[in-house]
């Protein structure tokens, strides 16, 4: 593999010295870029784009051609694992992801098949290898998965949900069934992320998008417990380098101490968490990633720069900060505003590293 030319992102995750704060954006390869829309149209549909290694590589690299980002993130979807388990993933126009065979019973959980990530999800591994080759060592590549709890929300609800009534009914009425499902999913995520690491991912992230809908007690039992299992099962070194792992629970700002105790390297913060407070609480244990409100990218470049400064000052001097949005970039953000954001982080952060 090529020698890494810019390792700021990996160094920051390990709380090692950097010259400026590294920055990338969740969903940086996406619909706000006209070139992404053109490539997606060429692919035909979203999953065809994910399953074509060359096109997945192309959309992964598109934001890097526009902006001096410090990391690339694999272009894929969090629902690849349930799709590999035979739930029949499809996308309804305007509705988002759906499953034709959702989980409704203990019998459904019992019959979920094991899978080989190099077979059923070989297209993801091909994309990882292709992207690593084409990056030529410019920046590191991030691999990712959904968390067991978040995957379960889609698998039991049959798609997106606002109230999660089917899953919460299972959680309270049949907790043993849900634990069995989550345990199978945790094992699958470990296999999947380790396969991504072996294929070339230099850092991995677990997205717990829906952990924030739980009570604190339920979060620990049904989400965090299984993310802890994943952290324990991951390859933490490859190619002679540490492979950092980041956990991100949207709405999880009240549980940072418990998240940091899993042994992960970094925590993602959404925009509702004060980064200064987060650093006071867990900055001696983990790096922090975040956490500008994605909607700030609708503002003027000047206002974006002010917000960047506020967050940099909130984190303060020293190491262990990866700048990002608090969630994914919105599809109708002007690309030039994303560029202003990236440039502001690099231009304004050097003084915090001297």
From Swiss-Prot:
GO terms for biological process: protoporphyrinogen IX biosynthetic process from glutamate. Keywords: Cytoplasm, Decarboxylase, Lyase, Porphyrin biosynthesis. InterPro entries: UROD/MetE-like_sf (IPR038071), Uroporphyrinogen_deCO2ase_HemE (IPR006361), Uroporphyrinogen_deCOase (IPR000257). GO terms for cellular component: cytosol. Transmembrane segments: none annotated. Pathway: Porphyrin-containing compound metabolism; protoporphyrin-IX biosynthesis; coproporphyrinogen-III from 5-aminolevulinate: step 4/4. Pfam families: URO-D. It catalyses: uroporphyrinogen III + 4 H(+) = coproporphyrinogen III + 4 CO2. Its EC number is 4.1.1.37. GO terms for molecular function: uroporphyrinogen decarboxylase activity. Substrate binds at residues 27-31, 77, 154, 209, 327. The record marks 77 as: Transition state stabilizer. It is found in: Cytoplasm. Catalyzes the decarboxylation of four acetate groups of uroporphyrinogen-III to yield coproporphyrinogen-III. Homodimer. Belongs to the uroporphyrinogen decarboxylase family. This is Uroporphyrinogen decarboxylase.
């Amino acid at each position: 593999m090529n020698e890494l030319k810019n390792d700021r992102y990996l160094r920051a995750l390990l709380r090692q010295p950097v010259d400026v704060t590294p920055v990338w954006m969740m969903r940086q390869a996406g619909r706000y870029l006209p070139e992404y829309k053109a490539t997606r149209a060429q692919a035909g549909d979203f999953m065809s784009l994910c399953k074509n290694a060359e096109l997945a590589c192309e959309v992964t690299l598109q934001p890097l051609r526009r902006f001096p980002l410090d990391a690339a993130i694999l272009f894929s979807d969090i629902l690849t694992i349930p799709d590999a388990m035979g739930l029949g993933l499809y996308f309804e126009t305007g509705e988002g992801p759906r499953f034709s065979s959702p989980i409704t019973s203990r019998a459904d959980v019992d019959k979920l098949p094991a899978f080989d990530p190099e077979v059923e999800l070989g297209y993801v591994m091909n994309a990882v290898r292709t992207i690593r080759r084409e990056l030529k060592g410019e920046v590191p590549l991030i691999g990712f998965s959904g968390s067991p709890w978040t995957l379960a929300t889609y698998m039991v609800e049959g798609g997106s949900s606002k109230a999660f009534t089917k899953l919460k009914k299972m959680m309270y009425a049949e907790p043993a069934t849900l634990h069995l499902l989550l345990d199978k999913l945790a094992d699958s995520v470990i296999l999947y992320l380790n396969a991504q690491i072996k294929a070339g991912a230099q850092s991995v992230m677990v997205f717990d998008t829906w952990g924030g809908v739980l009570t604190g007690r339920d979060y620990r039992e049904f989400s965090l417990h299984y993310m802890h299992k994943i952290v324990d099962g991951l390859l933490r070194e490859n190619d002679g380098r540490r492979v950092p792992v980041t956990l991100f629970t949207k709405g999880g700002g009240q549980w940072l101490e418990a998240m940091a105790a899993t042994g992960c390297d970094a925590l993602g913060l959404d925009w509702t968490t004060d980064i200064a407070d987060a650093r006071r609480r867990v900055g001696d244990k983990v790096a922090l990633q975040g956490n500008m409100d994605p909607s700030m990218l609708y503002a003027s470049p000047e206002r974006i720069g002010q917000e960047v400064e506020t967050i940099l000052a909130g984190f303060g001097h020293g190491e262990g900060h990866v700048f990002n949005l608090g969630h994914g970039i919105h599809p109708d953000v002007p690309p030039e505003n994303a560029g202003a954001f990236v440039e502001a982080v690099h231009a304004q952060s050097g003084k915090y590293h001297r």
